[in-house]
């Protein structure tokens, strides 16, 4: 019975310690992934100017070997005017590049099918609704017209209450000018 745990221990240690015999090239795989990431990042950003260091690591290490070559980057600028320090700080968003290539009419708003159905239904309703008028008739705009019931329920003009004086003034004394302006604003 003691032989089984010892054999398992021996096989486990052999598998664990003997793993270095199978040569796994992890470093080259990591290097490939890192290079791929760096190239894709280089495509997105403009080249950083080499005239001044941008980070603390570059100051201490001095000039370092770059992972990205200019011929690797497809969209690299070959124009010497754009490689100045001002151009290094500009980043271009991806969607703007694709939007500039689109020359069709640009319509803003909802483009879903449900929105199209709603817009169509609204247009049909507007074209077929001949009963309603877009403008209120003159009789409704006059002071005796629209909202006349509400106006009847208000107190008389001389007995108006203001925010500062909630009680009506005795004898219908005129309110100061500031109170009259405030009352006119509240009427609207």
Swiss-Prot record:
GO CC annotation terms, alphabetical: extracellular space
| Pro-peptide positions on chain | 45-92, 153-188
Q: What protein name applies here?
A: Pro-adrenomedullin
A Pfam short name: Calc_CGRP_IAPP
Q: Print the keywords alphabetically.
A: Amidation, Cleavage on pair of basic residues, Disulfide bond, Hormone, Secreted, Signal
Describe the task this protein carries out. Numerous actions have been reported most related to the physiologic control of fluid and electrolyte homeostasis.
The residues forming the signal peptide are 1-21
């Amino acid at each position: 019975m003691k032989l089984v745990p010892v054999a398992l221990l021996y096989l486990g240690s052999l598998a664990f310690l003997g793993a270095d015999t199978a040569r796994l090239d992890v470093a080259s795989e990591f290097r490939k992934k890192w290079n791929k990431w760096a190239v894709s990042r280089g495509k997105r950003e403009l080249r950083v100017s080499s005239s001044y260091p941008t980070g603390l690591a570059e100051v201490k290490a001095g000039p370092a070997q770059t992972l990205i070559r200019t011929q690797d980057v497809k969209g690299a600028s070959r124009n010497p005017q754009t490689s100045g320090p001002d151009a290094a700080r500009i980043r271009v968003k991806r969607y703007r590049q694709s939007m500039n290539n689109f020359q069709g009419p640009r319509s803003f708003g909802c483009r879903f099918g449900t929105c199209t159905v709603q817009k169509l239904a609204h247009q049909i309703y507007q074209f077929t609704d001949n009963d309603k008028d877009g403008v209120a008739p003159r009789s409704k705009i006059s002071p005796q017209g629209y909202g006349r019931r509400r106006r009847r329920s208000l107190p008389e003009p001389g007995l108006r209450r203001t925010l500062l004086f909630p009680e009506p003034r005795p004898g219908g004394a005129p309110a100061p000018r500031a109170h009259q302006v405030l009352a006119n604003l509240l009427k609207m």
